[in-house]
Structures are given as structure tokens and as C-alpha cells.
């Protein structure tokens, strides 16, 4: 029986002290991109969520090189998701014996990377893809270009 070689590795970050919506803003920018491109994007973005996501991307790449022996040039982020974690609820004491609730939200981040050199479907898809060097000319007749039936036709 032939054993299929694994093409995906993942890194999981749980209970990261950050809102899931703020982490999703960054995750949406890196989903589907290559490893080098992801590192450039995360290092230049000005959000606090970039640092834990950058650590997870590094960890997933290290898992790929250690477990599968693949190079970092062939890695692509195939799946990246953010789920809400537990919410830590505390009470802040206020004046006159009152208290206000404080909610610290956490999130779970999952980064899945795929090695495109091992994935047959990915290689076939990009080898069969047709490149378009020139745009198709839009043939618009001269009379339609300037005679659109606007205000200039009426007297």
C-alpha cells in the first residue's frame, strides 16, 4: 500500500490576549500568500496583532522544514483562521462601593501551510494556467464614443 506524503503543516496559537476581530484584520491580508511575502507584510503592518501571527508563521515554517524537509521558498499559507477564545471577566472597583465589569477577550489562531512542490494539484493548476500578455482591445465605434445621447445632442 502506498503511503501518501503529507503536504501540510500547521501551527496553533491558543489563548492569545487579543480580540478575534483585530486578529482577523491581519489574517485576511496574509491568507493564500507565499511565506516570504507574508513575512514582508507582517513586518511592515502597524498592528499589534502582527507579532503573535508572525511568530506562528515562523513556527509553521520551522515545522515544515523539520517534519517534511521542505524549503521555505515552496511554502504557501493555505488556511489561516481566527476563532474566539475564552473571555476573562474581572471587576474594577469604582467610587461609592460600585464596580464595573472588565472583559479581556482572547482568541485562537491557526496557520496551515502547504508545500507546493509536493502538492500535485497545485503544480498542475499553475502549469496549465494561461498567461495573458495583452488585454483584449475594446472596439468602440467612433460614433458611439462621442454620440452617447447626452446633453450635447439636444438644442
From Swiss-Prot:
| Gene3D superfamilies, sorted | Ribosomal protein L22/L17
- Show the Pfam families listed in the entry: Ribosomal_L22 (PF00237)
GO annotation (BP), single: translation
Bilayer-crossing regions: none
Q: Which GO terms describe its cellular component?
A: chloroplast; large ribosomal subunit
Any one Gene Ontology molecular-function term assigned to this protein's record: rRNA binding
User: Which SUPFAM superfamilies does this UniProt record tie to the protein?
Assistant: Ribosomal protein L22
Where is the protein situated, by its record's location annotation?
Plastid, Chloroplast
Q: Which UniProt keywords apply?
A: Chloroplast, Plastid, Ribonucleoprotein, Ribosomal protein, RNA-binding, rRNA-binding
- The primary site where this protein sits is plastid
Instruction: Report the PROSITE patterns cross-referenced here.
Output: RIBOSOMAL_L22
Q: What does this protein do?
A: This protein binds specifically to 23S rRNA.
Mind telling me which PANTHER family this protein's record contains?
CHLOROPLAST 50S RIBOSOMAL PROTEIN L22-RELATED, LARGE RIBOSOMAL SUBUNIT PROTEIN UL22M
Record's family? Answer: Belongs to the universal ribosomal protein uL22 family.
Q: How does it assemble?
A: Part of the 50S ribosomal subunit.
Its recorded name reads Large ribosomal subunit protein uL22c
Amino acid at each position: 500500500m502506498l503511503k501518501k506524503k503529507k503536504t501540510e503543516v500547521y501551527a496553533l496559537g491558543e489563548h492569545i490576549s487579543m480580540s478575534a476581530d483585530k486578529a482577523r484584520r491581519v489574517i485576511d491580508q496574509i491568507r493564500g500568500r507565499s511565506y516570504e511575502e507574508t513575512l514582508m507584510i507582517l513586518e511592515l503592518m502597524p498592528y499589534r496583532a502582527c507579532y503573535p501571527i508572525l511568530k506562528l508563521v515562523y513556527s509553521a515554517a520551522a515545522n515544515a522544514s523539520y517534519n517534511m524537509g521542505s524549503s521555505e521558498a515552496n511554502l504557501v499559507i493555505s488556511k489561516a483562521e481566527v476563532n474566539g477564545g475564552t473571555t476573562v471577566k474581572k471587576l474594577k472597583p469604582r467610587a461609592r462601593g460600585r464596580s464595573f465589569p472588565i472583559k479581556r477577550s482572547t482568541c485562537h489562531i491557526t496557520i496551515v501551510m502547504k508545500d507546493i512542490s509536493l502538492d500535485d494539484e497545485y503544480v498542475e493548476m499553475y502549469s496549465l494556467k494561461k498567461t495573458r500578455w495583452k488585454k483584449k482591445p475594446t472596439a468602440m465605434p467612433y460614433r458611439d464614443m462621442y454620440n452617447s445621447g447626452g446633453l450635447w445632442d439636444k438644442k
